[in-house]
Structure formats: C-alpha cells, structure tokens
Amino acid sequence: LSCAKWLVGFGFALATSLAMAIEEPSYKLLLQEERMELRAYAPFTIAEVKVQGSFDEASRRGFRLIADYIFGNNRSISQPDRSEKIAMTAPVTVEAQTSAEGEAWRMHFVMPSTYRLQSLPKPNNDAIQLREVGEGLFAAIRFSGFTTESAIETRTQELQQWILTKGWAITGKAQIARYNDPFTRPFNRRNEILIPVKQP
C-alpha cells in the first residue's frame, strides 16, 4: 500500500513537471519519413540503474529507484551534508540487457543540461550509476498507446526494417522511450523506439 501511495504521489509530481516546459535531450533532425526519423543527438548525462524481472516489473522498480535519487536521496557536491532535488526530464528510457539470472533491463533518466557529470549530486544508493553519453545517430519511431511487449516488438521490427532499407548499420540495442506521466490518456501518449545506427 505504501508503494502504491508513493507511485500515485510521484505520478502527480511528474504530471505537474510535464505540464510545464520539460527538457529533452538535444538533437538535430536529419531525416523524417512518416513516423520514422533519423536524429543526431548531442552528448548528455544520465542516471541509470540495472534491474531484474519482467519489463513491467523492472520499469516500476527502476523508475522508483531513480526517482528516489532525483527527489533528494543524494549528496550535493557543493554541500555534502545536504541533498539536492533534480528537475524531471523526458524521456524515461529502458533497454534490455543480457543476464545469466534471467530478464534484466537498464533504465535511465537524462539529467538536466545545467549539470555535468562532475556537478551531479552523488547517489546514496550504489545501484544508481551516473555516466556521460557521447553524441550519436539514432533511428526513431513514434507511437501512442501503452508500451506493451507486443507493441514494442511490432514497432521495433518496423524500425529495424526501415534501417535496413536505408543501408545503415545497427550499432546497439533498441531503447524504449516514454515521455508522459502515468495519467496521460493512451491516445495522447508519446512513446518511441530508439536504435543507435551508423551510416556508411
């Protein structure tokens, strides 16, 4: 029950953040064909966590862990005896990981551009890792509705086929990106599959 109350409370906080102008990673749109895009992303910094379980289980647990970090379970760099709240950004991204222990996923939040890796508060939870992501090319497909496993599989296959028709090389795993709070109606939701690519 306490977990449910926490998630509802966080959902309202997230909804408030998303009602205002919320920051997203900076990218340049290089190509657009219907729902497909090729983007060149600038470098950004993330907070991430690796979690076990099904997609839904891992999403809930990973979300809670990183949200706990940005809401203040951390140590400020400038004042180590104090914590620091970090603004919510979008999207929240999940990526499948290889694990001998069963299903595993890596979830990350992009940190606001006002921070650099060296200036981010230190997590109190060792499961939270901070790292920089370099610039790179990503193919993307946008869709609404719920991010069910079948929807993710269908959109990923569509995007992979588009990449193949362009003659690009896939350089990493597909990422599921979600941009909305839990209270957004399914038909208004913005979801994306992102796949890192390399042009010949």
Model region roles, listed by residue range:
Residues 3-6, 12-200:
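A solvent-exposed interaction/effector surface
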